[in-house]
């Protein structure tokens, strides 16, 4: 090979390396999903979302109205609108449902019977609400680290989820602040459901 040809070859290789390193452009944007997060006061909604956002637990204050957090994951960003769970707030939840693409429902698995009954009623209402009934649901049985915590199977039976949510996209998972791997895995499953719903909408 002549010196000229060798020089051209080296220059072309340099060009390819330059393109690979410097000119490949920004990575594709992660999809964003708008979610609503509901549950009774004390269920742990704020603490779970703050932990996922790597916020200091010292700054966690129970939500009285609503707050919005952008929760980042490797393959998506979840814009979560958390609604306060007090008695006088829950009757206004439905005003904030519009535009939601998925639902996170947090319950205290170690709560009193009265609070568990109230949580069941609220979840039943959400699963049947016209603006939410077709959306993916992530149901988190929180506070599994407490001695009085009920198992997922007990929650599923008590909440009558099998007959009520038949045909819907839903996940019921145990969680606690002490097990972040399990919590992140639960949200990864929710993201999979959101992506599946997106793909179905495109095919239609």
Curated annotation (Swiss-Prot):
UniProt keyword Chaperone, yes or no: no
Keyword field: GTP-binding, Nucleotide-binding
GO molecular function per UniProt: GTP binding; GTPase activity
Binding site for GTP: 39-46, 82-86, 142-145
Matches recorded under InterPro entries: ARL15 (IPR042292), P-loop_NTPase (IPR027417), Small_GTPase_ARF/SAR (IPR006689)
Family: Belongs to the small GTPase superfamily. Arf family.
Protein name in the entry: ADP-ribosylation factor-like protein 15
């Amino acid at each position: 090979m002549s010196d000229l040809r060798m020089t051209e070859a080296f220059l072309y290789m340099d060009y390819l390396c330059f393109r690979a390193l410097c000119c490949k452009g920004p990575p594709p944007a992660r999809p964003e999903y708008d979610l609503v997060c509901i549950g009774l006061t004390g269920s742990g909604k704020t603490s779970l979302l703050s932990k996922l956002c790597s916020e200091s637990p010292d700054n966690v204050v129970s939500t009285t109205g609503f707050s919005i957090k952008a929760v980042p994951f490797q393959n998506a960003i979840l814009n979560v609108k958390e609604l306060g769970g007090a008695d006088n707030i829950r009757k206004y939840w439905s005003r904030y449902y519009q535009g939601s693409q998925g639902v996170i429902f947090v319950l205290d698995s170690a709560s009193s019977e009265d609070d568990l009954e109230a949580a069941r009623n609220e979840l039943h209402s959400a699963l049947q609400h016209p603006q939410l009934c077709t959306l993916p649901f992530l149901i988190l049985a929180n506070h599994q680290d407490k001695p009085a915590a009920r198992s997922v199977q007990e929650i599923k039976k008590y909440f009558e989820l099998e007959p009520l949510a038949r045909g819907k996209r839903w996940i019921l998972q145990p969680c606690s602040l002490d097990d972040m791997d399990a919590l992140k895995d639960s949200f990864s499953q929710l993201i999979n459901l959101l992506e599946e719903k997106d793909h179905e909408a495109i095919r239609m």
